[in-house]
C-alpha cells in the first residue's frame, strides 16, 4: 500500500545470505526439529542456492538433523498456497522427508499469470531499460507475465491498459487449462 501512495518510494530486494540461513537452520537443529524449507524459486533468486549452502554447512555440524531445502517454484501468492497446503500435509502426519517430496512434486502443478501496475520495478531490477519503462508508462503498457513450474517468468503479451491485460490473462487461462467449476 505504501508503494502505491508514495510513488517516490522504491523498494529493493536482495537474496538472503547463507549466514542468515545458517543461523535459522541451526536453531531448528539445536531444538531437534526436522525442517522443510520452501524457498523462493531458484529461477528468480540466488536465495535457493544460499539456503542449500547453509544446509550443507548445518549437516556437517549436525549430521543427524533432518533438513530439506525445496525450491517452491512459485513466486507470489502461489508460494503462500503451497506453504498452507504443506502445513495441512504435515498436520496429517507426513514426515519431514515425505513432506519435502510432496512439496517438490506439488510445485510442478503451479502456474500463474499476472500483470504489473507500472513498469518501474522491471526497470529498477534491470529487466528493461528505464527509457522503455518511461515510454511504456506514458502509453499505459501492461505486460502479461506468466510463471511456469520452475518459477521462470516469461512475457506472454503486451496490452494497452489494465482491463485488456486482465482479459488476456483470462483468455490464456481458458485456452491452456481445463477446469470444472
Each model region followed by its residue ranges:
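Short, charged beta->alpha transition segments
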Residues: 18-28, 53-57, 169
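N-terminal glycine-rich anion-binding loop in soluble enzyme alpha/beta folds
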Residues: 1-20
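Residue-identity detector for threonine
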Residues: 13, 17, 35, 95, ...
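Short catalytic-loop micro-motif centered on adjacent basic/acidic residues
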Residues: 12, 37, 69
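N-terminal glycine-rich phosphate/adenylate-binding segment common to multiple enzyme folds
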Residues: 20-48
Amino acid at each position: 500500500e505504501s508503494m502505491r501512495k508514495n510513488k517516490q518510494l522504491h523498494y529493493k530486494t536482495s537474496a538472503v545470505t547463507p549466514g542468515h540461513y545458517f543461523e535459522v537452520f541451526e536453531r531448528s537443529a539445536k531444538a531437534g526439529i526436522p525442517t522443510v524449507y520452501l524457498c523462493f524459486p531458484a529461477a528468480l533468486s540466488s536465495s535457493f542456492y544460499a539456503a542449500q549452502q547453509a544446509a550443507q554447512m548445518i549437516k556437517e555440524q549436525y549430521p543427524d538433523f533432518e533438513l530439506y531445502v525445496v525450491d517452491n517454484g512459485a513466486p507470489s501468492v502461489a508460494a503462500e498456497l503451497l506453504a498452507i497446503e504443506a502445513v495441512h500435509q504435515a498436520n496429517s502426519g507426513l514426515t519431514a522427508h515425505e513432506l519435502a517430496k510432496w512439496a517438490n512434486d506439488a510445485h510442478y502443478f503451479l502456474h500463474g499469470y499476472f500483470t504489473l501496475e507500472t513498469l518501474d520495478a522491471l526497470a529498477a531490477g534491470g529487466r528493461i531499460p528505464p527509457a522503455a519503462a518511461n515510454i511504456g508508462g506514458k502509453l499505459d503498457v501492461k505486460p502479461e507475465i506468466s510463471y511456469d513450474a520452475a518459477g521462470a517468468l516469461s512475457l506472454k503479451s503486451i496490452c494497452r491498459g489494465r482491463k485488456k491485460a486482465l482479459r488476456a490473462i483470462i483468455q490464456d487461462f481458458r485456452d491452456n487449462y481445463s477446469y470444472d467449476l
